[in-house]
Design a protein with these regions (language model features):
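Short, positively charged, Gly/Tyr-enriched micro-motifs
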Residues: 43, 57-155, 159-166, 210-212, ...
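Acidic, glycine-enriched active-site microenvironments
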Residues: 97-107, 187-191, 341-343, 349
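Short, conserved DNA-binding cores of transcription-related domains
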Residues: 1-84, 88-92
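Basic, amphipathic alpha-helical segments enriched in Lys/Arg and hydrophobic/aromatic residues
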Residues: 337-413
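Helix-loop elements that line ligand-binding/catalytic pockets
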Residues: 270-344
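Short, conserved catalytic/metal-binding motifs centered on acidic residues
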Residues: 28, 39, 79, 121, ...
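RNase H-like nuclease fold core
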Residues: 133-214, 221-226, 233
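Conserved beta-strand -> loop -> alpha-helix junction used to position metal-binding or nucleic-acid-contacting
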Residues: 218-221, 227-268, 376
Length: 413
């Protein structure tokens, strides 16, 4: 049988012997080249050997798709600086204390887990489910490490249901650095109560809290009041896309009512000319084809109510698309509100009440035009992760999964 000689990739170890066991696994008996270890009580170097601890069997990176195990007896050292003869087992730079896989194998497994599941990787890498789960828990924290951040210029807050139809919500708080395209999750909180969100925001270190310029969220009061209580009114932005959703809903309901009326009053030939008006009303006017513009003119002729309401919606969209200061933007919104109130359109009455309530926070959008588009993209990733893992019901597990999927390649590649 041909032999292959390759060096062990851990310089602090010396191979004493090697063999292949009955399962076809490669067993390497090794010993450490270290001559001291930090005392677990005082932290000073302990250099006096005092026997050995129990033998450890640690799994290492595979060779030619064959599992490799390192067998080592950890040396115990006696600390000369401690009066009560404290002994400490040697610690290793290639192994986390209490772990059963080397750091190298741990990093490899984390790469395999990106956009995958523990069950899948457990089968592919022939490693126990519980052992892999413990490896994840040792490699990835269940909460944010603030030392990894120097700035939190833009935050996004949104909720997502872990169990559809059960109102089992979690709050996901994410950040998007100015010069980085990658979104990172800084918290997954159980529920969506104001007190829980506010409590987390208060845990943000003061030096990072000062760097927060914008916090994008929807109009849910639990998020709005939590942000304003801890960070103030100036940073909160009620996202423009949630605003757009609210004023397009009444327009859509009016369209349904008007189309139902027109179906009963127009002939089949005339009504057929209005086919596809739902998408015509939702498109930007500059994106309409000539045929769609003709359909829109015809719809306006048959339904003056829809024409007026559609013009109001287009005008508000135009205001939100305008690059201007907060003062100028709010002035435009106030004029729009007055114009709608004076008109015959009543479909926006409910939206106007909501807009008046959150107008200041909508106006903050004009400062630097931040929005929570990155949050909506993150929501899609979370939905995929939930389906891939057949449900994730613990906030700690969801945080770890998102950490791997979002930052795994950057950290472990």
């Amino acid at each position: 049988m041909a032999e292959l000689h390759i060096p062990l990739d851990i310089k602090s170890l010396e191979i004493l012997s090697q063999h292949i066991n009955s399962k076809g696994e490669i067993i390497l008996t090794v010993q450490s080249k270290k001559t001291e270890t930090p005392c677990h009580k005082c932290g000073k170097p302990a250099t006096s050997r005092y026997g050995y601890g129990p033998e450890l069997t640690i799994r290492h990176l595979p060779i030619l798709d064959t599992p490799v195990y390192l067998v080592i007896k950890p040396v115990r050292y006696k600390c000369s600086d401690c009066d009560d003869l404290i002994t400490t087992s040697e610690s290793y730079d290639w192994l986390k204390r209490g772990a059963h896989v080397t750091n190298g194998l741990s990093d490899y497994l984390m790469r395999q887990l990106i956009h995958s599941t523990i069950e899948d990787v457990s089968i592919k890498e022939r490693i126990g489910y519980k052992q892999l789960e413990n490896t994840v828990n040792k490699a990835i924290d269940i909460q944010v490490n603030w030392q990894n951040y120097t700035s939190l210029s833009l935050l996004g807050i949104d909720e997502i249901a872990l169990k559809k139809g059960h109102k089992d919500y979690v709050t996901v708080i994410s950040t998007k650095p100015e010069k980085a395209a990658q979104v990172t999750v800084i918290a997954v909180l159980p529920g969506r109560l104001k007190k829980d969100v506010a409590a987390f925001l208060k845990t943000i270190p003061e030096n990072l809290r000062k760097t927060i310029q914008s916090v994008c969220t929807d109009m849910y009061d639990g998020f709005v009041f939590a942000v304003t209580e801890v960070l103030g009114d100036a940073v909160l932005i009620v996202d423009r896309y949630h605003v757009a959703k609210l004023y397009r809903q009444p327009l859509d309901k009016l369209r349904v009512r008007e189309m139902k009326r027109l179906k009963s009053t127009l002939s089949e030939e005339e009504y057929a000319q209005l086919e596809g008006v739902m998408w015509t009303l939702r498109k930007k006017h500059e994106c309409l084809s000539d045929a769609e513009k003709e359909t829109l003119v015809l719809l306006y002729h048959y339904s003056p109510k829809l024409k007026e309401a559609h013009s109001h919606a287009l005008r508000l969209t135009q205001i939100l698309n305008t690059h201007c200061s907060k003062k100028s933007g709010l002035a435009k919104i106030n004029r729009w509100i007055k114009r709608v109130k004076k008109s015959d359109s009543t479909c926006f009455n409910g939206f106007l009440i909501t807009l008046e309530k959150y107008k200041t926070y909508v106006g903050n959008y004009f400062k630097n035009r931040s929005n929570s588009g990155f949050v909506e993209g993150l929501n899609n990733l979370i939905k995929v992760a939930k389906r891939r893992c057949y449900g994730i019901f613990k906030t700690e597990t969801l945080f770890q999964r998102l950490y791997l999927d979002l930052q795994g390649f950057e950290i472990y590649a």
